């Protein structure tokens, strides 16, 4: 079996050996394309270098090569465990990965490892140690219908056709009902709704321009379904600060 984790913070909690890879992207912002290609990664690299001062060589080695190694290893394994949370940040990554697995013809058993229900939108964050047994307990096997649904979400996400965005307005299948606020949030982003900007403006008014830390904490507490880290929130904060 092979495991793919969403981020290094999760990797540090893993206390078992095996084929473990880390996905180090945040596809919820920046340029995207339906299919992974050299141009796809080139555009992503330019975005993170400009937006987050990332190092080009480190991005290639730690992000691109890591994911390519994962896909190569997957072809030799029958079972894949994808460790991703329910929030928008993680979900967009998950949709992309499932679409790429479909693209390479992966037909093995696909497991989505979800954080304990008790942690809510905080996901794996409160969990200190993760054992191999946890990977079994928290895993949900994705049947072909579920895989197809997530693949459709990815293609809707990258589409520029507003008709495709209708998927984000529909209720998700029952096993994934928790995705409803996540899909609503993405629908609002796609359709130009100012809700997210209004949320940031409200936090600016409450905490002031120097209140980034308490504002970020409040945002995570009340709107955890976005799943944004401090870097993503800082970009939003600075953008609204420049206007206000």
Residues covered by each model-derived region:
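Short acidic, hydrophobic short linear motifs in intrinsically disordered regions
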Residues: 208-219
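A short acidic (Asp/Glu
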Residues: 12-16, 32-33, 90-98, 121-126
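Charge-enriched amphipathic alpha-helical scaffolds
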Residues: 198-199, 220-244
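A short alpha->loop->secondary-structure connector
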Residues: 97-110
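Short, conserved secondary-structure transition motifs
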Residues: 113-131
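A conserved mid-domain beta-alpha-beta active-site/ligand-binding segment of alpha/beta enzyme cores
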Residues: 127-206
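Long, hydrophobic/aromatic-enriched structural stretches that serve as scaffold segments
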Residues: 53-95
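A structured, charge-rich N-terminal accessory region that forms the first stable segment of a protein
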Residues: 1-62
């Amino acid at each position: 079996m092979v495991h793919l984790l969403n981020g290094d913070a999760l990797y540090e909690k893993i206390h078992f050996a095996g084929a473990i890879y880390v996905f180090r992207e945040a596809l919820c912002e920046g340029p995207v394309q339906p299919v992974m290609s050299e141009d796809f990664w080139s555009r992503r690299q330019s975005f993170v270098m400009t937006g987050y001062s990332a190092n080009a060589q480190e991005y290639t080695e730690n992000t691109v090569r890591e994911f390519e190694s994962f896909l190569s290893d997957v072809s030799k394994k029958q079972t894949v465990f994808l460790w991703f949370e329910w929030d928008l940040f993680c979900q967009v990554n998950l949709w992309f990965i499932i679409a790429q697995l479909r693209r390479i013809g992966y037909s093995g058993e696909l497991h989505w490892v979800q954080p304990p229900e008790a942690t809510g939108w905080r996901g794996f964050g409160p969990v200190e140690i993760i054992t191999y047994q946890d990977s079994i307990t928290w895993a949900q096997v994705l049947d072909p219908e579920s895989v197809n649904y997530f693949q459709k979400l990815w293609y809707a996400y990258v589409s520029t056709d507003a008709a495709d965005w209708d998927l984000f307005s529909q209720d998700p299948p029952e096993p994934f009902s928790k995705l409803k606020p996540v899909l609503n949030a993405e629908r609002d982003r796609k359709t130009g709704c100012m809700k997210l900007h209004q949320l940031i403006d409200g936090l600016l008014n409450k905490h002031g321009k120097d209140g980034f830390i308490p504002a970020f904490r409040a945002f995570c507490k009340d709107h955890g379904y976005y799943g944004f880290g401090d870097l993503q929130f800082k970009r939003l904060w600075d953008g609204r600060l420049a206007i206000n």
